[in-house]
Amino acid sequence: MPEDIPQISAPTIYDHLAVILDQMSSVAWQKLGLQPDMVTGKIEPDLTQARVAIDVVGFLASQLETQLDEEDKKHLHSLVRDLKINYVQKQGGT
């Protein structure tokens, strides 16, 4: 194998979780009615589905936390917090 070709390693479970977390956070924003649906292009809030997506994001964040540096941990915590705050606001809470 030539030395100038970089070796590519297989993704870890944490790499896969990060991708899923990113997808679920997008779904959560869509289901909160804060982003258009990726398929229809319409704003279609569904707070029941938003809650599930937010719970999944929170769980995935807890699994990834040990693999992250402090800056990435803060970003992840902010994401989960922002999703939860927006969920409460959409429900009519304060």
PLM regions and their residue ranges:
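Well-ordered alpha/beta subsegment
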Residues: 61-68
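N-terminal intrinsically disordered, cationic/polar leader segments
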Residues: 1-59, 71-94
